[in-house]
A protein has these predicted regions:
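Hydrophobic positions on the alpha1 helix immediately C-terminal to the Walker A/P-loop
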Residues: 220, 224
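Conserved lysine of the Walker
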Residues: 217
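Conserved helix-turn-beta segment of the N-terminal RecA-like "Helicase ATP-binding" lobe
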Residues: 243-272, 483-490
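Accessory interdomain/linker segments of ATP-dependent helicases and helicase-like nucleic-acid enzymes
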Residues: 1-86, 470-476, 482
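Conserved helicase motor core of SF1/SF2 NTP-dependent helicases
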Residues: 231, 239-243, 300-303, 308-319, ...
C-alpha cells in the first residue's frame, strides 16, 4: 500500500472540518446558555502571584470549572464585561465584536474564599501581555471553550501539498513495509547516549529513539542539546505541549545556556517567565535559528515554520513527544533541520483526533495518525531504545516490559514498598482488585467508594505521597473528584492527589496510581497504548480496579499479559518451573480419581504431568481445556495467546472457534484451571531460533522438565523438535482417540 498526497489531504481536511463543526456548534450557542451549562464562566481578576498564578473570584452559584481543565480567557470590553448584558449574543459573536484580548488558560486549582458567596480559582498559562493587562485594569474575564488547533492542521495541509520538496517526499511518498523494520539497539543508563548519537549523526541525517516510561529521555535530550550548543550549532526542540518544553529548559545541563540568554521559547506565559526568568521570549513566534542558540517551540508553531521556509533553518531539529505527532508533522522535521532526531514511544498514546473511528478504518488513515509508529516500522533509520527505567521497580518493569518485548530493566533506587495496606504489593508494580461492577455504569458507586477509602488510607500512612487516580472517561473522573471532596475534610483536592483522565497525564510520575476500568465500553479502557500510559505512572504501586470478570473481554495480548502478571499471587505461574514430587495416592478431603483412570500413554504416574497446548489445538478443538480436565496442570504459552489474536485477522479462519477458545481460556484463567507462561528462550540449545514462535512455545515446555511436560500439538515439526529434547508430545488426533477408546 502506498499513500498519495490526496490521502493525506483527505484525512487532514476531514479532521479540520470535524473540529470546525464541533467547535462551531459550541460557540454559535448563546453565551448565556453556555454559562448556565458550565461551558463558560466569568471571574474578576484579584491578583497575580509571585509564581505567575492569576487569582480570580467566581460566584459559587456558577458551575465550577474542572481542575486542570483548559479554557480560552477573553477580555470583553465595555458593557459586555458583565454577563448580564450578553442578551442573545453567541460566544462567537461576543468574541468577534467585543473581545479586547485573549489568552489560553488552565484552571490549576479551586478553593474557598472569605466571602461564602464566592470561591477563588487559580489560572495558569496566561500570555505575558495578557497578564500585564490584567494587573493594569483588573477586569472581569470570561472563560470559554478552548480554541482548537485549526492553524496546525492547515499548516500540515500546505506541507503535504508541496510535491517539490524532496526531503518531505522521502517520507510522505513511502510504501508500507511487509514487516516492521523496528529492531532498535538497546541503550542502558550507563551508556553515553549523547556521544553515541553524535557519532551516528556524522554519517546519518536521521535517528529514531524510543523512550519507554521513566527512562530519562528528557534528561538525555538536554544533555545532547547542551553538547550541540557548545559546538555552536543552531538547535530546535519541538514538542506537542509547552509543559514538555519547560521541563527540558529546566534541566541542569541547559542552565548555563538559559542564563546566558541563548535559549528562547515561543508563546511564553507569565508563570513560565516566573519559573525561568532568564528564558527569553520569542515575541512574535517567528523562526529565529541562530548559531549556538536553542529555540523551543510547540508543534503548532514549528509546523508554521516548516510551511513557510524553503531553506532548512536549523542545524539540528529534535522532536520530543514524537508519538503525539501526525505523520505530516513527523515529516515537517525534515524541512526544519539538516539533522533530525525523533524521540517518542510508539507504545504510548497516539495523537487524539476528532474524526470518527469508522472513517479512519474505512480509509486506512491510522498510519497517518500514528506517525511515529509508521516512521519506525517503515524506515530503516538508525534506531535506539532506552532500556533502563528509573521510575519503575523491578516487578513493575517486568510487567510494563510486556509492551516492550520484555526488554525493560529497572534501575530504580526504590525496590521495596513499605506499607501496611495489604493490596499494595511490597515489591511495587500492579495489583488487580476485582469487584462486582454493574454493566454499563460509568461511575460505579462501590468502586468509587473503595477508591476514596484507599486514597485516604495511603495518605494516612504517608501524607506527602503523590497519588494519581485515573480513568479513560471524563464522567468517571468528575464523579470521583466530587466523591473525594465529599469524603474528605477539605473543600478541594490537595496538590499531591490528581484525579484525571489518562490522556492528560502522559509524562506524569507519582508514588501511587489507581486505574479504574468501569464495566462499560471496556475496550476503550483496555486499548493498548492508553492502558500502558495508565499503568506506568507509579514509582511504587499501581492498583487496577475493574470487574472481577474483566479477562473475559477482548484485549490485546500485551494487556492480557499485564493483567495476568498483576494477579500472579492468585493463579498465574511465570518464571518458577515446578518441582518434581513423588506420586502416590493422596486423600485430602476427596479421592484423587486420576489414580483410577485408564492409563494414557503420555502420562507418567510418579511425576507432575503438565499439558502445554499449542495454537493449532485451540483452532481445531476450542474446548480442549475441559477435555483435559482438572486433574492435570494446564499451561498456555504466552505466544499461543498472541497467535490466537492474530488469527482473528485471517478471513479463512473459523472465527466462531476462536471466540469459543478465547472464552474458555479466560474462564480457565479466572477459575485457576490453567495458567500462562512466557517461557525462557535461554533454555533452548544452540542452533534454535529464539525468535521462532514454535521455539518460544518449546521453551515453555523446557521450563517444566522437572516434571513431565506434555506438548499437545498437531505440528509435526514442533513434535520432532520436542522429541529431540526429551519432551513428551501428543497430537490432538491421538489425544482424542485415546479418550474415545
Amino acid at each position: 500500500m502506498k499513500y498519495t498526497r490526496l490521502d493525506y489531504e483527505n484525512f487532514l481536511n476531514t479532521e479540520l472540518e470535524t473540529q470546525k463543526r464541533a467547535y462551531g456548534e459550541l460557540v454559535t450557542t448563546k453565551a448565556i446558555t453556555l454559562k448556565e451549562q458550565g461551558k463558560v464562566f466569568v471571574g474578576r481578576f484579584i491578583k497575580l502571584q509571585e509564581n505567575g498564578m492569576a487569582i480570580f473570584k467566581v460566584r459559587v452559584s456558577d458551575k465550577m470549572p474542572r481542575k486542570n481543565s483548559f479554557w480560552t480567557a477573553s477580555y470583553l470590553i465595555g458593557d459586555m464585561g458583565s454577563y448580564r448584558n450578553w442578551a442573545d449574543y453567541s460566544w462567537a459573536s461576543l468574541r468577534e465584536n467585543y473581545q479586547g484580548d485573549f489568552s489560553e488558560a488552565l484552571c490549576a486549582w479551586i478553593s474557598k474564599s472569605e466571602d461564602s458567596n464566592f470561591c477563588l480559582i487559580g489560572i495558569k498559562n496566561l500570555a505575558l501581555g495578557f497578564a500585564q493587562k490584567l494587573e493594569k485594569e483588573r477586569p472581569i474575564i470570561a472563560f470559554g471553550p478552548k480554541d482548537p488547533p485549526l492553524k496546525y492542521l492547515m499548516n500540515l495541509i500546505d506541507i503535504v501539498r508541496d510535491k517539490d520538496c524532496e526531503r518531505t517526499a522521502s517520507i510522505l511518498d513511502f510504501s508500507l513495509a511487509n514487516e516492521s523494520y523496528w529492531h532498535p539497539k538497546q541503550v542502558e543508563s550507563t551508556e553515553n547516549l549523547s556521544d553515541l548519537l553524535l557519532e551516528t549523526l556524522k554519517t546519518k541525517d536521521e535517528i529514531s529513539i524510543q523512550g519507554p516510561p521513566g527512562t530519562g529521555k528528557t534528561y538525555r535530550m538536554a544533555s545532547l542539546t547542551s553538547k550541540l550548543l557548545a559546538e555552536n550549532k543552531s538547535v530546535l526542540v519541538t514538542t506537542l505541549t509547552n509543559q514538555a518544553l519547560m521541563e527540558l529548559a529546566e534541566k541542569e545541563d541547559l542552565e548555563p545556556f538559559v542564563n546566558a540568554g541563548r535559549v528562547t521559547k515561543t508563546s511564553m506565559t507569565v508563570d513560565e517567565h516566573k519559573r525561568l526568568p532568564h528564558l527569553l521570549q520569542n515575541l512574535e513566534n517567528k523562526c529565529n535559528a541562530a548559531e549556538g542558540k536553542l529555540s523551543l517551540a510547540s508543534f503548532y508553531v514549528s509546523s508554521g515554520w516548516a510551511k513557510d521556509h524553503d531553506e532548512i533553518p536549523f542545524d539540528y531539529a529534535i522532536m520530543d513527544e514524537a508519538g503525539q505527532a501526525l505523520l505530516p508533522m513527523i515529516t515537517a522535521m525534515k524541512k526544519l533541520g539538516k539533522k533530525v532526531i525523533w524521540v517518542g514511544d510508539q507504545n504510548q498514546l497516539a495523537p487524539i483526533v476528532e474524526t470518527e473511528e469508522k472513517l479512519i478504518n474505512d480509509f486506512g488513515w491510522s498510519y497517518i495518525i500514528k506517525g511515529f509508529n509508521t516512521l519506525c516500522d517503515n524506515f530503516q533509520y538508525p534506531e535506539y531504545m532506552l532500556s533502563d527505567t528509573f521510575r519503575l521497580t523491578d516487578r513493575s518493569a517486568k510487567c510494563t516490559g510486556v509492551f516492550y518485548n520484555n526488554s525493560l530493566k529497572s534501575v530504580s533506587k526504590i525496590q521495596e514498598i513499605v506499607s501496611s495496606i495489604e493490596l499494595l504489593n511490597k515489591n511495587g508494580g500492579p495489583s488487580f482488585y476485582g469487584m462486582d461492577l454493574k454493566v454499563g455504569e460509568m461511575s460505579p458507586e462501590n468502586a468509587i467508594s473503595f477508591i476514596c477509602n484507599l486514597v485516604h488510607k495511603i495518605i494516612s500512612e504517608n501524607p506527602k505521597a503523590s497519588i494519581a487516580v485515573l480513568s479513560k472517561f471524563r464522567d468517571t473522573v468528575r464523579d470521583i473528584q466530587k466523591a473525594y471532596v465529599l469524603s474528605s475534610s477539605t473543600r478541594d483536592i490537595p496538590d499531591n492527589i490528581r484525579i484525571e483522565t489518562v490522556d492528560r497525564v502522559q509524562g506524569l510520575t507519582v508514588d501511587y496510581c489507581i486505574y479504574i476500568i468501569p464495566n462499560a465500553s471496556t475496550r476503550f479502557s483496555l486499548e493498548k497504548e492508553l492502558f500502558n500510559v495508565a499503568t506506568s505512572r507509579s514509582k511504587g504501586c499501581t492498583v487496577i480496579i475493574a470487574d472481577k470478570k474483566l479477562l473475559r473481554n477482548d484485549m490485546s495480548e500485551e494487556v492480557r499479559k499485564y493483567l495476568l502478571k498483576a494477579q500472579d499471587d492468585k493463579f498465574v505461574t511465570f518464571n518458577e518451573p515446578p518441582k518434581s514430587e513423588p506420586g502416590g495416592l493422596k486423600v485430602v478431603g476427596k479421592i484423587d480419581l486420576s489414580q483410577f483412570e485408564k492409563k494414557k500413554r503420555e502420562i507418567v504416574p510418579d511425576k507432575e504431568n503438565i499439558y502445554i497446548i499449542d495454537t493449532n489445538v485451540f483452532v481445531n478443538c476450542p474446548d480442549i481445556i475441559s477435555r483435559i480436565g482438572r486433574n492435570y496442570k494446564i499451561v498456555i504459552p504466552a505466544k499461543v495467546l498472541e497467535e490466537l489474536d492474530k488469527l482473528k485477522l485471517k478471513p479463512s479462519i473459523d472465527k466462531k472457534n476462536l471466540n469459543i477458545a478465547a472464552k474458555n481460556i479466560n474462564t480457565a484463567f479466572v477459575n485457576s484451571f490453567s495458567s500462562m507462561d512466557e517461557g525462557d528462550v535461554n533454555l533452548l540449545p544452540n542452533g534454535f531460533d529464539r525468535n521462532n514462535p514454535d521455539c518460544m512455545i518449546l521453551s515453555v515446555a523446557l521450563k517444566y522438565k522437572g516434571g513431565n511436560p506434555i506438548l499437545l500439538t498437531s505440528d509435526n515439526v514442533l513434535q520432532s523438535r520436542a522429541s529431540a529434547l526429551g519432551i513428551t508430545t501428543i497430537s490432538l488426533r491421538e489425544f482424542l482417540q485415546e479418550r474415545r477408546s
